Amino acid sequence: MPLSSPNAAATASDMDKNSGSNSSSASSGSSKGQQPPRSASAGPAGESKPKSDGKNSSGSKRYNRKRELSYPKNESFNNQSRRSSSQKSKTFNKMPPQRGGGSSKLFSSSFNGGRRDEVAEAQRAEFSPAQFSGPKKINLNHLLNFTFEPRGQTGHFEGSGHGSWGKRNKWGHKPFNKELFLQANCQFVVSEDQDYTAHFADPDTLVNWDFVEQVRICSHEVPSCPICLYPPTAAKITRCGHIFCWACILHYLSLSEKTWSKCPICYSSVHKKDLKSVVATESHQYVVGDTITMQLMKREKGVLVALPKSKWMNVDHPIHLGDEQHSQYSKLLLASKEQVLHRVVLEEKVALEQQLAEEKHTPESCFIEAAIQELKTREEALSGLAGSRREVTGVVAALEQLVLMAPLAKESVFQPRKGVLEYLSAFDEETTEVCSLDTPSRPLALPLVEEEEAVSEPEPEGLPEACDDLELADDNLKEGTICTESSQQEPITKSGFTRLSSSPCYYFYQAEDGQHMFLHPVNVRCLVREYGSLERSPEKISATVVEIAGYSMSEDVRQRHRYLSHLPLTCEFSICELALQPPVVSKETLEMFSDDIEKRKRQRQKKAREERRRERRIEIEENKKQGKYPEVHIPLENLQQFPAFNSYTCSSDSALGPTSTEGHGALSISPLSRSPGSHADFLLTPLSPTASQGSPSFCVGSLEEDSPFPSFAQMLRVGKAKADVWPKTAPKKDENSLVPPAPVDSDGESDNSDRVPVPSFQNSFSQAIEAAFMKLDTPATSDPLSEEKGGKKRKKQKQKLLFSTSVVHTK
């Protein structure tokens, strides 16, 4: 062991004196070169040279004593801890530790567990082994055999150049936006004093949350408050889309010292001012086998509102809240202040007052009263705005009339002074005729402008109309004639002018109750073949649901289904295939599309099989984790390999007994030759159906006496005189022959599809061996006859190959 330097010994003694320990004797002994044995109770000798790790031992020998003097004797404790901690890393500094001795003694004592005083104990706590065990956060996903990537992140290389491709990858998952999903799948009642032109031009434009007065949700089940687990009273919805009772969410927000709190479901920020009124309506959830009614819808190209063909109208302005016929087909419903007061605020007020009467003596009553107070504030604001709005509306209307009438009167005065008097006088006659058809009291200048616009309208529309026709034809080819063009002219409008051409329209079938369920293209092609186009198809059809496929609107889906381009992104919809029957479509039409219908049927069956197999595999894996393993299934259908005792003893049609002991395997009374459960089943059920027809019933005592098989003693008494004791019966095909397995697939499932199942190796191997033995047994029965007739010895036959696993035989 190398000796410690005097400097190290002196420094160590100084540290011991400061800490109040008595280690002077150990220090003197160490300076003489004698290393005393170290006991378990005493601390490690700090005077000795500190042992470095295996990594540092070779590096420390490179330096001599002259190198030691270059280091300062007294270095701060933090620098030593930093150097010591860096030695455990992969790229540690191979410089030897400081020869100071004091800190090295503390470092060694922290790992060897020696007793220290209180001063050293406080310093040693900083050198805990956890400080050198690597990072504090350890990924243990490999122990769970499970990996999870957060949704919306396409790559792990954030902030580096290596992950740039993942961000540009168009096949990656798009980040999920809660607000976009909420606004795509809900209907909003908004205040009418705002401009919503952009929302009727682009379906993906988000509605300003401050303009929302009420949110309407259509779901298959009534939501419940996640706090009280009851149907929400005076329900409020957050911006993240979660619904709560108004009193419950106020109670939850009051628990936080901040003005906002995290959502108890998704941990998004929830502000009190962002809570909006919500109404949830329950809709019927259609499943396979239900009868659904779909109606024919019509939508002009470029318009985002699709209406039933029977109720179709030009959607020139947004639909208001009071329009009950068309309100379910629009995303935005404009409401006035009076409508918000009567249809939103008053309903919540009644619900809160009823809840307060029921829970007046509960701790929740204070939050119900707070909700009522906030509702009164909202009511006062709406009523005040409504009163002031009436006054402002009257003033604005008067100003608009003054502004509009002044230039019109001025224009009518200066029109006769224009240069081309002949054209104006000739055009004036037509203007007066048209005006006489409408209202004679209207000014002459206003119809003049409208007439000029109407006359000049067809000229620039010629080229766009042709382009629309070509684009529409492409849509029909891609979508199986989903949409058709409306070529008929519109009737005369109120102003007396006719629209010479109309834009193309999309026709499609949607669920009658307004759900986003649309007809499958296969059914659409059947209807187009039957009626010529969807425009001439029935307005409503009813049929049985065969398949429902759910989708979420994306850019790719929007390009494939252009007739659904009015749906916003992330909007959920479903394509429904129906079993159309006469009289909706004729039998000839169904026969024409029978191949497509059968193909889709086989695809559904295949998908169902794969799902069942997957469920079975998952169930087996889960059972294996719990120590439950599947039972071994041994097929006992072959009666020759597994003979049953009942089947031979209870047959009354022929004599009982085996055919031969060599060929087909003789049936003996020994229990070893029977199947395991045949004897027990026979004893437990002596009155079987086969035995009751005339065969004698057996019991335990008379089994040996009444048995038709001769015993061994009887065979000895008879001797060789009567050798042919066993009666020979013709082998039955249903007992001795191989029973072909049922036409099932490898998993034991069958269907009417044309798929050929893969044979099991176990069954094919056993059947091949048994068939080979049967072939050998067949000529053995004819040997006595050939010997009697010919009297000659048979020639030695060549050996036959029983079974071979190889496919190609080469010499």
Curated annotation (Swiss-Prot):
Explain the purpose of this protein: E3 ubiquitin-protein ligase that catalyzes monoubiquitination of 40S ribosomal proteins RPS2/us5 and RPS3/us3 in response to ribosome stalling. Part of a ribosome quality control that takes place when ribosomes have stalled during translation initiation (iRQC): RNF10 acts by mediating monoubiquitination of RPS2/us5 and RPS3/us3, promoting their degradation by the proteasome. Also promotes ubiquitination of 40S ribosomal proteins in response to ribosome stalling during translation elongation. The action of RNF10 in iRQC is counteracted by USP10.
Molecular functions per Gene Ontology = transcription cis-regulatory region binding; ubiquitin protein ligase activity; zinc ion binding
Q: Tell me which Pfam families the record gives.
A: zf-C3HC4
* GO BP terms, alphabetized: negative regulation of Schwann cell proliferation; positive regulation of DNA-templated transcription; positive regulation of myelination; positive regulation of transcription by RNA polymerase II; postsynapse to nucleus signaling pathway; protein autoubiquitination; protein monoubiquitination; ribosome-associated ubiquitin-dependent protein catabolic process
Q: Which InterPro entries match?
A: MAG2/RNF10, Znf_C3HC4_RING-type, Znf_RING, Znf_RING/FYVE/PHD, Znf_RING_CS
Which residues does this entry mark as bearing Phosphoserine? Answer: S5, S110, S128
Q: Name one GO cellular component term.
A: cytosolic ribosome
Which PANTHER family does this one have?
E3 UBIQUITIN-PROTEIN LIGASE RNF10, RING FINGER 10 FAMILY MEMBER
What spans are recorded as compositionally biased (Low complexity)?
18-31, 78-90, 104-113
Q: Which gene encodes it?
A: RNF10
Q: Where is the composition biased (Polar residues)?
A: 1-10, 653-662, 802-811
Protein's UniProt name: E3 ubiquitin-protein ligase RNF10
| Compartment(s) where it occurs, according to its Swiss-Prot or TrEMBL record | Cytoplasm; Nucleus
What is the catalytic activity of this protein?
A: S-ubiquitinyl-[E2 ubiquitin-conjugating enzyme]-L-cysteine + [acceptor protein]-L-lysine = [E2 ubiquitin-conjugating enzyme]-L-cysteine + N(6)-ubiquitinyl-[acceptor protein]-L-lysine
Task: Identify the enzyme class.
Answer: transferase
User: Could you say which EC number(s) this protein's record lists?
Assistant: 2.3.2.27
Q: Where are the zinc fingers (RING-type)?
A: 225-267
User: Cytoplasm among the record's keywords?
Assistant: yes
- Does the keyword section mention Cytoplasm? yes
**Annotated stretches, region: Disordered:** 1-119, 653-672, 724-761, 776-811
Report the domain of life of the source organism. Answer: Eukaryota
The scientific name of the source species is Homo sapiens (Human)
* Similarity section: Belongs to the RNF10 family.
Which pathway, metabolic or otherwise, does it act in? Protein modification; protein ubiquitination
Extract the ranges annotated as region (Interaction with MEOX2).
101-185
